[in-house]
């Protein structure tokens, strides 16, 4: 067993156990699922409804002026402006985006030095902004005149009064954590603790205080002990009430002059106006609500045709609740983990959840309702889940793999979508497996058995299984039987579609192909590929940056050079000119500060292998505010009792500020406690030591950002705990043998159900067939005309059976023996003797009363009454070897083989005539010597049997029914009417009367045996081992119309076979002979529509005209010997060979229509219907092909040794054999309709051959026995 098979088996078993759990305890599981849904949806209480997110409108900065109010707008004037863009905004928001880093980085710097010095410069920037004034011709403009003046905070925000501004300008910066006091900041030993002390203990869904003051999301701030970029980002937010272009321009120019950003390419060209809608937007919900209504209606009208569902409304409602809960759980979990579900630009997410959820609902419903109706509900649920387990997990793994690949592209848009998608998939899988499966089990449980019997659906319109409480079924279940009698492999994948309505066909098509999920996966891959290449943070820009860095002219190849003071202009971005505070002490040349060692800052101490914090500006920095929560601005203004509902604010272009600090400033800003044992020591330490995660100070908890990686780890841990909890619940609640055989006598193991690949287990029944016993060896030849059945075993015995009653009508013994009676009574008597023989009877031999008292064998079976005309010779067998006289010259007795009567007698042997002669004289019979061969007839007419040599069976003297001769073994057999045509290995052709058991005529012997026969109307064709063909014509010599018909037409279209009277004289004339039809032995022979087709080991087929033996075509197309041939009245010819190929030919033109390789090995049998070709091979595989195109529909894997056991009952009904059973298949769709077991006696025997009769009966060859099975009536109605 391969790894994939073991994994598939384990997944199937896990889903099977889960199905048992859900169906056994539905109420607790539904309550548990409901609690999980409510818990996951709790964060949604703080979110607006979908569609109420902010709306944007962009205008250019140049010549901007506030729009007029609504009354000033001209009526009917066409405009592209939205309706809400009227009047002045609530406020103008100006963000000053600061990026700061310490460069160059020394290895003796601490982790806290990354953000302490950059944050300290925020106080200086705030002072510069507050002190900025504009002097022009109109007067002096200051910040206090233009900013938004705020008053007190709301009464419930007392904790924030020292952190947010009151009674002044609304100006926010990280310095607000320390009341904009630099001394407080410098004296704070735990900066991170101060920043996070006002954070809620649980994950917050709306804007937090840190986001408000920093102005950027927490993960972009860089204020963390574990950051590796060594860059700090924050904003200083100014809120203006009036727009003054000159003041804003002068502020921008001053800040960019003081803190230039040489590589900044941000464009200050547009204003973004953001309008906030009402909290309740019902109009925006109409498309989504309509979608769910359509979903409900579609599932309801689809399940109306599934009669195995009790409540269609309930099932549809459960499906809608499942999909809606999946969406709400996804959004709630995303919100809980800090992912803001704005759905801006991605509002397709709810509809993707609908599509995926609908498809999974259809898959589960289809799988469960296709299970056998006679099983318990929990077993049906378990089996339905198990059958779809592999496809569900395979699709789940594929989707998660695509999401994982997309996440590691590091493109923000793709990462956000992937995080939403993974949460949605996990939520949907959780609800499908727990909620919908449990609801489905409750609904099916309500379907009572009486209602099922009244309204059986197309999937279960077959008779139910035998009552499970009967001991016979229990014994049969314990018997050894293969786990899967049949495995149907569909090419391409198909599903159960037996007489289904069109709406159910659509449903099952979606469930089978997973079309929606595959299209979504393909679209996701294409979308990810496009974004990876086109996104600003994607592959194209990354490659361009790499090429630039590796270029000899790139900035990375030029080392920084020390420049003496005073050589650069004031606008140069050197940190010494832009960062030093104006009151910083000027040190003389070659001197250092008091606390700094002379070696510190030297070139040897710089960590060159660490990532250089290059301050870069990209297009994503222009609108970093978009990454904030959509509740960021409404939350800020709501603190001052200002609402933004139905109003808008204007966001001004960002002002970039770059700060580069040298290591000396980082050391000067360090707190005294930073150098203690709490942080890495300031002495020389290995490079990157603090990056491995320094410990926080004792007793002080180091607050870290709740990053996505932490959330992922938390989610993984939660999932593991949940799985372990469910496993423990299963172990506690379910016993080890739950749902298996030990639970009851009629409960069946799932592996014993003949399920196909899609989990459908059709009803199985058990009947007692008519067993035809009469052969001691395996049956080799079998023929029937619909009413009579002829069988021949390897011993040479021929039995004629009545196909209606199963009675043995005639028994023809081996050659070389005489027959005294051939009536029906003797046949029944012989049948009884053979049954006693096969049953191992211990009765003693019956001796003739007038025989002398001779020594008897101590035990042994009685001689069969079949040879009653012979004296009993068993008394002559002497087993007392010790009392026998020793012969001086030992003789070798001749072997007692009767099959070869014409062997040479030249070698001396022991003569038994002295013993046998006395017994024959006492019986009154003449001594019988070995008869010689009858001389061949001089002409081509077959010699007639000497019927006048013996009287009727009623006469006293025994008659010779036929002259014994060395005919050889029987190689071929055909039956028509009451005539049996036998072809023997000696080349002799014989015609027998099937009713009387007499030989009508025979041909002369030739050196080549007869390998195949065709008996059609009055023509007989014999194919011989040497490749020749003999054409015979059958004639009678009584009246002009000697034929009478027996019975009525059967299931076939042809009338019943003619019956020849026993008083008729039957003769056969050899009309034509084709001496060299093939170069090698003929192995296949068929005739229809006046054409005869032969197949040989010379790899060719030949088509002859039946009336004059004229060869019409020689067909070449196989690379191996021909093994089977089929031809019908429509002149369609099919052939199979040892090369495993099947060829379709046109008999009218001799052209090959199609050629396919069907099997791995010989093609053993071949038959056709009006629409398909059915083949079987030595690989025990039955394949069904399209007759017109040669396309393979599907294949059925048979049991070992049962590959050739198949028969076609009608154009859409196929019967196949298995280990002690026969199965019925629908040819149109490949569905297993029913499996019928033939009792305990046949369980261990494979069905080697199946022959379909015209009276709705099937004959199965189980070695030395035949089983006569009548087709179930429901299949006849289906036909």
UniProtKB/Swiss-Prot annotation:
Question: What's one GO BP annotation on this UniProt entry?
Answer: immune response
Q: Where is the SSD domain?
A: 284-442
Recite the UniProt keywords alphabetically.
Cholesterol metabolism, Cytoplasmic vesicle, Endoplasmic reticulum, Glycoprotein, Golgi apparatus, Isopeptide bond, Lipid metabolism, Lipid-binding, Membrane, Methylation, Phosphoprotein, Repeat, Steroid metabolism, Sterol metabolism, Transmembrane, Transmembrane helix, Ubl conjugation, WD repeat
User: According to the record, what induces this protein's expression?
Assistant: By androgen-bound AR and glucocorticoid-bound NR3C1 in a prostate cancer cell line (LNCaP).
The cross-link Glycyl lysine isopeptide (Lys-Gly) (interchain with G-Cter in ubiquitin): at which residues? Answer: 454, 466
> Mind telling me how this protein is modified after translation?
Ubiquitinated at Lys-454 and Lys-466. RNF145 triggers ubiquitination of SCAP, likely inhibiting SCAP-SREBP complex transport to the Golgi apparatus and the subsequent processing/maturation of SREBF2/SREBP2.
Pfam family for this entry, one: Sterol-sensing
Query: Which cellular compartments is it found in?
Result: Endoplasmic reticulum membrane; Golgi apparatus membrane; Cytoplasmic vesicle, COPII-coated vesicle membrane
- The short sequence motif called ER export signal sits at 447-452
Q: Which residues lie on this side of the membrane: Cytoplasmic?
A: 1-18, 301-312, 366-401, 445-518, 731-1279
Entry GO MF terms:
protein-containing complex binding; sterol binding; unfolded protein binding
Q: Which GO terms describe its cellular component?
A: endoplasmic reticulum; endoplasmic reticulum membrane; ER to Golgi transport vesicle membrane; Golgi apparatus; Golgi membrane; membrane; SREBP-SCAP complex
Give the chief site where it resides: endoplasmic reticulum
Transmembrane domains' residue ranges: 19-39, 280-300, 313-333, 345-365, 402-422, 424-444, 519-539, 710-730
Omega-N-methylarginine, modified sites: 1051
Q: Where is the composition biased (Polar residues)?
A: 877-891
Outline the segment boundaries, as ranges, of region: Loop-1.
46-284
How does the record classify its membrane topology?
Multi-pass membrane protein
Q: Which residues form a coiled coil?
A: none
**Chain spans, region Interaction with SREBF2:** 731-1279
Q: Which residues carry this modification: Phosphoserine?
A: 822, 838, 851, 907, 937
Annotated glycan sites: 263, 590, 641
Where do the WD repeats start and stop? Answer: 771-811, 952-1002, 1005-1042, 1077-1114, 1117-1155, 1158-1195, 1197-1235
Its UniProt domain note says: Loop-1 binds to loop-7, enabling interaction with COPII-coated vesicles. When levels of cholesterol in the endoplasmic reticulum increase, Loop-1 binds to cholesterol instead, thereby disrupting direct binding between the two loops and preventing the SCAP-SREBP complex from exiting the endoplasmic reticulum.
Q: What does this protein do?
A: Escort protein required for cholesterol as well as lipid homeostasis. Regulates export of the SCAP-SREBP complex from the endoplasmic reticulum to the Golgi upon low cholesterol, thereby regulating the processing of sterol regulatory element-binding proteins (SREBPs) SREBF1/SREBP1 and SREBF2/SREBP2. At high sterol concentrations, formation of a ternary complex with INSIG (INSIG1 or INSIG2) leads to mask the ER export signal in SCAP, promoting retention of the complex in the endoplasmic reticulum.
Q: What is this protein called?
A: Sterol regulatory element-binding protein cleavage-activating protein
């Amino acid at each position: 067993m391969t790894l994939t098979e073991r994994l598939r088996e384990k997944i199937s078993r896990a889903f099977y156990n889960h199905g048992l759990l859900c169906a056994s305890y539905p109420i607790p599981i539904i309550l548990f699922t409901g609690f999980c849904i409510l818990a996951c949806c709790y964060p949604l209480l703080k979110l607006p409804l979908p569609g109420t997110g902010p709306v944007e409108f962009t205008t250019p900065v140049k010549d901007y002026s506030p729009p007029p109010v609504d009354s000033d707008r001209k009526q009917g004037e066409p405009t592209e402006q939205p309706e809400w863009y009227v009047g002045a905004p609530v406020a103008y928001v100006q963000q000053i985006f600061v990026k700061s880093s310490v460069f160059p980085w020394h290895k003796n710097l601490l982790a806290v030095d990354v953000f302490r010095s950059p944050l300290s410069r925020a106080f200086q920037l705030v002072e510069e902004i507050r002190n900025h004034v504009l002097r022009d011709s109109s007067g002096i403009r200051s910040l206090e005149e233009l900013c938004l003046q705020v008053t007190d905070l709301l009464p419930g925000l007392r904790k924030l009064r020292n952190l947010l501004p009151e009674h002044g300008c609304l100006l926010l910066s990280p310095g607000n954590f320390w009341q904009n006091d630099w001394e407080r900041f410098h004296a704070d030993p735990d900066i991170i603790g101060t920043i996070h002390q006002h954070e809620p203990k649980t994950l917050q869904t709306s804007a937090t205080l840190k986001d408000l003051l920093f102005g950027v999301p927490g993960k972009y701030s860089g204020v963390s002990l574990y950051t590796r970029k060594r860059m700090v980002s924050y904003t200083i937010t100014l809120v203006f009430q009036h727009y003054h272009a000159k003041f804003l321009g002068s502020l921008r120019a001053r800040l960019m002059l003081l803190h230039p950003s040489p590589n900044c390419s941000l464009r200050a060209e547009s204003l973004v106006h953001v309008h906030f809608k009402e909290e309740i937007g019902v109009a925006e919900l109409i498309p989504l609500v309509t979608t769910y209504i359509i979903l409900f209606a579609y599932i309801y009208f689809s399940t109306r045709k599934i009669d195995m569902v009790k409540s269609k409304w309930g099932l549809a409602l459960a499906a809608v609740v499942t999909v809606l809960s999946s969406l709400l759980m996804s959004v709630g979990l995303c919100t809980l983990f800090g992912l803001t579900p704005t759905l801006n630009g991605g509002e397709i997410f709810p509809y993707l959840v609908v599509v995926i959820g609908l498809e999974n609902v259809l898959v589960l419903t289809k799988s469960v309702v296709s299970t056998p109706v006679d099983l318990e509900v929990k077993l049906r649920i378990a089996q339905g889940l198990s059958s779809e387990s592999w496809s569900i997990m395979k699709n789940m793994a594929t989707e998660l793999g695509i999401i994982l690949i997309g996440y590691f592209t590091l493109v923000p848009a793709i990462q956000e979508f992937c995080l939403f998608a993974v949460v949605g998939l996990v939520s949907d899988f959780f609800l499908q497996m727990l909620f919908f499966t449990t609801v489905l089990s409750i609904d099916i449980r309500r379907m009572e058995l009486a209602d099922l019997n009244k309204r059986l659906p197309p999937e279960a319109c077959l008779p139910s299984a035998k009552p499970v409480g009967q001991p016979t079924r229990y014994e049969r279940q314990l018997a050894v039987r293969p786990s899967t009698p049949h495995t149907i492999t569909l090419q391409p994948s198909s599903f159960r579609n037996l007489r289904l309505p069109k709406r159910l066909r659509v449903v099952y098509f979606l469930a089978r192909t997973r079309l929606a999920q595959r299209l979504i996966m393909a679209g996701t891959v294409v979308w990810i590929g496009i974004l990876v290449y086109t996104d600003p943070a994607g592959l194209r820009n990354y490659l361009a940056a790499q090429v630039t860095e590796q270029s000899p002219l790139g900035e990375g190849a030029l080392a920084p050079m020390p420049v003496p003071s005073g050589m650069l202009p004031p606008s140069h971005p050197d940190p010494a000119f832009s960062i030093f505070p104006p009151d910083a002490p000027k040190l003389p040349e070659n001197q250092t500060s008091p606390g700094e060692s002379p070696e510190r800052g030297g070139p040897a101490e710089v960590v060159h292998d660490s990532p250089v914090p290059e301050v870069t500006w990209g297009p994503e920095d222009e609108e970093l505010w978009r990454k904030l929560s959509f509740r960021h601005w409404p939350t800020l203004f709501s603190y001052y009792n200002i609402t933004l509902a139905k109003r808008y604010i204007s966001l001004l272009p960002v002002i970039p500020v770059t700060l580069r600090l040298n290591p000396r400033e980082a050391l000067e800003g360090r707190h005294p406690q930073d150098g203690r044992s709490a942080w890495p020591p300031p002495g020389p330490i290995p490079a990157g030591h603090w990056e491995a995660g320094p410990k926080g100070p004792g007793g002080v908890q180091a607050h870290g950002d709740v990053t996505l990686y932490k959330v992922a780890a938390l989610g993984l841990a939660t999932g593991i705990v949940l799985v372990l909890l469910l496993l423990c619940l299963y172990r506690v609640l379910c016993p080890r043998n739950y749902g298996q055989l030990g639970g009851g006598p009629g409960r069946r193991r799932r592996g014993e159900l003949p399920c196909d690949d899609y989990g459908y287990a059709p009803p199985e029944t058990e009947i007692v067939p008519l067993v035809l016993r009469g052969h001691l060896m395996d049956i080799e030849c079998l023929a029937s005309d619909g009413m009579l059945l002829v069988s021949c075993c390897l011993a040479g015995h021929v039995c004629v059976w009545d196909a209606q009653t199963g009675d043995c009508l005639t028994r023809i013994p081996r050659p070389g023996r005489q027959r005294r009676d051939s009536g029906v009574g003797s046949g029944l008597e012989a049948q009884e003797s053979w049954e006693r023989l096969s049953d191992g009877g211990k009765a003693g031999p019956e001796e003739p009363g007038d025989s002398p008292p001779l020594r008897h064998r101590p035990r042994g079976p009685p001689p069969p009454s079949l040879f009653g005309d012979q004296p009993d010779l068993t008394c002559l067998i002497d087993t007392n070897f010790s009392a026998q006289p020793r012969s001086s010259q030992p003789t070798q007795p001749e072997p007692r083989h009767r099959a070869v009567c014409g062997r040479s007698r030249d070698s001396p042997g022991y003569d038994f005539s002295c013993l046998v002669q006395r017994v024959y004289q006492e019986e009154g019979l003449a001594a019988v010597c070995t008869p010689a061969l009858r001389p061949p007839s001089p002409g081509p007419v077959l010699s007639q049997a000497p019927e006048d040599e013996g009287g009727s069976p009623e006469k006293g003297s025994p008659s010779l029914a036929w002259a014994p001769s060395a005919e050889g073994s029987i190689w071929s057999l055909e039956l028509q009417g009451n005539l049996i045509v036998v072809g023997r290995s000696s080349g002799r052709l014989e015609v027998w009367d099937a009713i009387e058991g007499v030989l009508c005529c025979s041909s002369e012997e030739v050196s080549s045996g007869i390998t195949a026969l065709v008996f059609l109307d009055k023509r007989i064709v014999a194919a011989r081992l040497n490749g020749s063909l003999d054409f015979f014509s059958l004639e009678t010599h009584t009246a002009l119309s000697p034929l009478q018909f027996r019975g009525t037409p059967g299931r076939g279209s042809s009338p019943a076979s003619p019956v020849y009277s026993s008083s008729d004289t039957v003769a056969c004339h050899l009309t034509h002979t084709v001496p060299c039809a093939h170069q090698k032995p003929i192995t296949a022979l068929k005739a229809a529509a006046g054409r005869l087709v032969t197949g040989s080991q010379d790899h060719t087929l030949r088509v002859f005209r039946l009336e004059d033996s004229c060869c019409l075509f020689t067909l070449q197309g196989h690379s191996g010997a021909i093994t089977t041939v089929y031809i019908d009245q429509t002149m369609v010819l099919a052939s199979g060979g040892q090369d495993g190929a099947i060829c379709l030919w046109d008999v009218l033109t001799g052209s090959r229509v199609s050629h396919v390789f069907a099997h791995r090995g010989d093609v053993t049998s071949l038959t056709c219907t009006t629409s398909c070709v059915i083949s079987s091979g030595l690989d025990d595989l039955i394949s069904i092909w399209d007759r017109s195109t040669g396309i393979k529909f599907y294949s059925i894997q048979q049991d070992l040794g049962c590959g050739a056991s198949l028969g076609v009952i009608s154009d859409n009904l196929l019967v196949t054999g298995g280990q002690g059973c026969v199965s019925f298949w629908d040819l149109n769709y490949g569905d297993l309709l029913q499996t019928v077991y033939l009792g305990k006696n046949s369980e261990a025997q494979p069905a080697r051959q199946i022959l379909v009769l015209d009276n709705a009966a099937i004959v199965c060859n189980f070695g030395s026995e035949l089983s006569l099975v009548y087709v179930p009536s429901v299949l006849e109605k289906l036909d």
